[in-house]
Amino acid sequence: MALSAEDRALVRALWKKLGSNVGVYTTEALERTFLAFPATKTYFSHLDLSPGSSQVRAHGQKVADALSLAVERLDDLPHALSALSHLHACQLRVDPASFQLLGHCLLVTLARHYPGDFSPALQASLDKFLSHVISALASEYR
């Protein structure tokens, strides 16, 4: 399902509100993913995965940067995320289901920090946005 103008506006407005804290929330979502879905740790065996570790924060910032790029380039997600898709599919060989798990944990994290803003409309728009991001990231797997 395509992102409507309202979806785009809601996602962009939330991203603007998150500001410089995007990396904090993506790091928390990554930590939440590791706790809730321990199999996702498989791809990070070379990192210190303890909560708050500098390595998890660094990867959380990479996730934040990728999502911020996606928000900026909503009209061309497959092209904007093609290098990341190739990296995850061909070099890192990450199971694309892990992207869905991280997306779910990001929704939970954002809802926890912004309960007053997290309306059903915003949740639906973010879910659609993350679905499009996940689809773009999984494109090299086909």
Curated annotation (Swiss-Prot):
Species for this entry: Pongo pygmaeus
UniProt gene name: HBQ1
Listed GO CC annotations: blood microparticle; haptoglobin-hemoglobin complex; hemoglobin complex
CDD domains: Hb-alpha-like
Domain of life according to the entry: Eukaryota
Positions bound to heme b: 59, 88
Organism taxonomic ancestry: Eukaryota, Metazoa, Chordata, Craniata, Vertebrata
InterPro entries membership: Globin, Globin-like_sf, Globin/Proto, Hemoglobin_a-typ, Hemoglobin_oxygen_transport, Hemoglobin_pi
Name by which UniProt lists this protein: Hemoglobin subunit theta-1
Residue ranges annotated for the Globin domain, each copy included: 2-142
Keywords: Heme, Iron, Metal-binding, Oxygen transport, Transport
Protein family according to the UniProt entry: Belongs to the globin family.
GO biological process: hydrogen peroxide catabolic process
Segments passing through the bilayer: none
